[in-house]
Amino acid sequence: MLNCNSYMGDKNNKKLGLKESISLVVGNMIGAGIFMLPASLAKFGSISIFGWVISGFGAILIALIFKRLSQKFPGKSGPFHYTKEGFGEFLGFFVVWGYWISILLTNAGLAIAITSYSGVLFPILQNNVQSIMFSIFVIIVIAIINNYGIKTAGKFQLVTSILKILPLLLTIVIAFFVFNTDHFIMLNTSGESNFNALTATAALTFFAFMGIESATIPAEGTHNPSKTIPKATMIGSILTICIYLFSSIALMGIISPIELANSTAPFADATGIVLGNIG
């Protein structure tokens, strides 16, 4: 995730364009949530798909708010400035610190997710000590890259966004070959009412939409922010919602509910199932 320090002191020719701004939204939204949530949602059954739809609709509404605010206050950097403009510096102070703490916690979760998936390729990372050290290493490396400036950080964000999207798109593609509709027979397997299951899955999946405001944060380092940021916010949000929904459906069609609930790396397991079937 890009660090706000990397937005300081960059020249105009080093400002972010539309594709980098979109990658900010997509890359920061597609984090630990989508890679780890399918296992948590498996116990609810196929009703979790509707949870994604509900939270996705809520995310679109929030994206529209940020779009409007970025047009009303062009060049102003995200939630802090928006709050300050409307309610004063005192509340703006609390918002910026609350936002910083939330991002700090999110980065920790993302590092854990990266380590969990890396453990599939490197079993040594399944050891507690090695996994902790690797997670810390990931955070340090990203922090160092951020300090090289906004353009470098933007390019890095674009590359990492593509790398995060690829396994999700791969899951959607391979689902065409091994999709099992029997996995969707039971709508609600949680033992709770449909309403309670929907509210629970909507709350869980909404975590995956953190980062929807990302294009607004480096407004001062964005080229033509009044046009670039609104476009990036909406395009990035809609693209991410579609990827979330279709990759989740694909994953549920590949892995049985019981196996999915016990998985520590669902998308890696889905690839393993396909390769096993081919073999």
Language model features with spans:
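Hydrophobic transmembrane alpha-helices that form the core helical bundles
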Residues: A39-K43, I60-I139, A143-N147, T152
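Select transmembrane alpha-helical segments in multipass membrane proteins
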Residues: K15-V25, G88-I101, F134-V138, E192-T205, ...
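Lipid-exposed faces of alpha-helical membrane segments in multi-pass integral membrane proteins
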Residues: V26, I30, F50, I54-L61, ...
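Helix-loop-helix junctions that connect adjacent transmembrane segments
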Residues: Y7-N12, S48-I49, L125-S131, L158-G279
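Residue-level recognition of membrane-helix boundary sites in multi-pass small-molecule transporters
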Residues: E20, I47-F50, L91, T152, ...
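Hydrophobic/aromatic residues within transmembrane alpha-helices of membrane transport systems
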Residues: G17, G31, L69, G88, ...
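Membrane-interface "cap" regions at the ends of multi-pass membrane proteins
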Residues: M1-A39, F44-I47, A59-K67, G75-K76, ...
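Transmembrane helix-loop junctions in multi-pass membrane proteins
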Residues: G33-P38, I145-K151, N180-T181, I278-G279
